[in-house]
Design a protein with these regions (language model features):
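ATP/pyrophosphate-binding catalytic subdomain of soluble kinases
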Residues: 52, 147-192
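A glycine- and small-aliphatic-rich helix-loop capping segment at beta-alpha/alpha-beta transitions
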Residues: 83-94, 116-117, 183-192
Length: 304
């Protein structure tokens, strides 16, 4: 925690600490960060880097004749178009690739929404990734694992059977959630950071701010179009990954500068689960947070 000495004074997020965090010059972020930080010029460059990273881990493991096991998000998403081009053009064999997706929306009863639903992650990935990959690359449906509300241990057991995750890719949500591991919110019940880090695949109710932000990003501001629940991979599976790569592509999403800076420069807190990545094994080397320059620039709070 010595990295934060003189910067952050509160364990929970406070106004005074946020003023400091938001004003740190871009070139000093790495000085105060316990995780690796990479700043790129544009979101297009970010998507290309993310797709290339995904492709390279598959290629490298193919050369070693070992399977590749990665956790993938459905957000950000533009990197998948680039990944399809790389895989098809370079004829990357996918027969030993295992894909574990982070989450999926549920209806109010806790059942999976249909793939035809406009908010379905399964439907989106089928259309924008799986159906576009050349069939001779060898990726089968059995290699694609989604969290299942009817069998919550399925993905956990499969990850364990395969020997763990090589890389977890993801974004960071409005209040710092990774996948749908949102800040725990209960009037009566309390959990510790240790409890949260040991959380496994589970069903959650969306927080109110997630409704708002996701409706703006994906439903034209229609909060009623956002399914109320979700099934998410647990923090345990994420934190047990050998490497974690998070990407903040929020140049046009005005909430992402704060999310990015908190994840990198605020001490671990349940208020913002993204900060818990700092508790990964040797996080300066094993956790990398990438942002485009517009997202990473300091924000002083003045109206734009």
């Amino acid at each position: 925690m010595n990295k934060f000495e003189g910067l952050v004074t509160h364990q929970t997020v406070s106004n005074i600490d946020m003023e400091k965090i938001m004003s740190i010059p871009l070139e000093e972020i790495d000085k105060y960060s316990n995780v690796g930080v990479r700043i790129v010029e544009t979101t297009n460059e970010l998507y290309k880097i993310m797709a290339r990273s995904m492709a390279d881990i598959i290629i490298n493991n193919n050369h070693k004749d070992i399977p590749t096991k990665i956790i993938l998000p459905v957000g950000p998403t533009p990197q998948y178009e680039v990944l399809v081009q790389i895989c098809n053009n370079e004829k990357i064999k996918l027969s030993r690739l295992w894909l574990f997706f982070m989450d999926e929306y549920l209806d109010w009863e806790g059942r999976l929404i249909p793939e035809s639903h406009p908010m379905s992650f399964r439907g989106y990935m089928k259309k924008h990734l799986f159906e576009l990959l050349n069939s001779n690359l060898g990726l089968s449906d059995s290699q694609i694992i989604w969290p299942d509300p009817a069998d919550l241990d399925n993905n956990c057991n499969k990850i364990k059977e395969l020997g763990g995750i090589d890389v977890c890719y993801g974004g960071i949500g409005y209040h710092g959630h990774i996948a749908f591991n949102e800040p725990f919110n209960s009037y009566y019940s309390r959990i510790t950071i240790k409890d949260f880090l040991n959380s496994r695949t589970r069903v959650i109710d969306l927080n109110s701010d997630t409704f708002v932000v996701n409706s703006i990003c994906g439903a034209g501001g229609n909060c009623y179009g956002i399914p109320p629940r979700a099934v998410t991979i647990g923090m345990k599976q994420i934190m047990e990954s050998k490497r974690i790569e998070l990407y903040c592509d929020g140049g046009d999403l005005k909430w992402q500068p704060a999310t990015f800076r908190i994840a990198c420069m605020h001490p671990p807190t349940l208020d913002r689960p993204g900060t818990l990545m700092q508790l990964h094994n040797d996080p300066k080397k094993t956790v990398l947070v990438t942002a485009d320059r517009r997202t990473a620039e300091p924000v002083m709070g003045a109206p734009k």
